[in-house]
């Protein structure tokens, strides 16, 4: 499952070409004629914001000779995408609007068969989702209960502060596996043990999606971890979340609740809306996996 090309082909045929995929963020397409590109398998995908402010997804290839249309990861067109091969021009809605020597095309350059191939595309909660499957089920139905869970965070009202790409020389599932359990914490992240409970973890399954809830701000219950003394990493976590460890009179078991109260208390001052979140969500990691490969550490 991790090294077989035959199994990879099965994944392509039954997963990647059938489901909803995350294409980017709504804030990447703030204005009409903005665009981004993304890749899945051997395909390049073009996602645009039309003059009507609708987001659309297309195969990023000119319909004439299959040349890559948009060469950059993101940008803004004046009015059209211009193919660098024969100068065919498409607007942000995927319509072919001009081609040299139009009289040589008996069907006319405005024929629908010459427009870019459009893919299902929807915006949701600050995300832009697309699918290679023209018959994909509605996004709301595909997300199931995870949709309402994640909408509570109002991602669409947040601003991106860092965007980083790290390439791993491994099968994609090796990465996803690592973000679907806390069994590895002791071996890989022992420095986290004084402020993260790696054992009392709630796991919820929602059809093809899942989440697990990891208590933060409390020591691991493993026998070698002090349950009373506030360790150095717990001190840092407390400071990050509005609790001064120098003034705190409680022990390590009481820090998590103090963090939750501090977050509520300073929410208005910081401009945070926690009205849809419970207290545990203010301290813990509500970790979601949107099938098959999107993981979210919401804390």
Model-derived regions: residue spans:
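Short Pro/Gly-enriched beta-strand edge/turn motifs at strand-loop
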Residues: 17-29, 99-105, 288-292
């Amino acid at each position: 499952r991790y090294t077989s090309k035959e199994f990879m082909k099965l994944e392509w045929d039954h997963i990647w070409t059938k489901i909803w995929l995350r294409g980017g963020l709504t804030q990447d397409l703030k204005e009409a004629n903005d665009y981004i590109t993304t890749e899945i398998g051997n395909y390049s995908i073009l996602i645009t914001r039309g003059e009507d402010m609708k987001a659309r997804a297309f195969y990023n290839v000119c319909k004439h000779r299959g040349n890559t249309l948009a060469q950059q990861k993101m940008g803004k067109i004046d009015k059209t995408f211009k193919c660098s091969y024969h100068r065919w021009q498409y607007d942000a809605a995927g319509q072919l609007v001009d081609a040299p020597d139009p009289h040589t095309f008996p069907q006319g350059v405005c024929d629908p068969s010459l427009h870019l191939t459009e893919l299902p595309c929807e915006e949701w909660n600050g995300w832009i989702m697309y699918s290679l499957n023209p018959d994909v089920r509605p996004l709301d139905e595909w997300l199931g209960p995870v949709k309402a869970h994640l909408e509570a965070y109002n991602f669409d009202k947040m601003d991106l502060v860092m965007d980083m790409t790290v390439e791993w020389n491994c099968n994609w599932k090796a990465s996803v596996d690592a973000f679907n359990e806390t069994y590895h914490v002791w071996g890989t992240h022992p420095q986290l043990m004084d402020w993260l409970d790696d054992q009392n973890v709630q796991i919820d399954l929602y059809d093809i999606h899942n989440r697990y809830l990891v208590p933060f701000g409390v020591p691991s219950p493993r026998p070698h971890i002090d349950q009373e003394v506030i360790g150095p990493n717990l001190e840092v976590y407390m400071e990050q979340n509005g609790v001064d460890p120098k003034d705190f009179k409680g022990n390590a078991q009481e820090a998590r609740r103090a963090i939750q109260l501090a977050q509520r208390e300073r929410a208005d001052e910081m401009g945070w809306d926690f009205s849809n979140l419970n207290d545990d969500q203010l301290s813990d990691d509500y970790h979601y996996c949107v099938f098959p490969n999107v993981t979210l550490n919401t804390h």
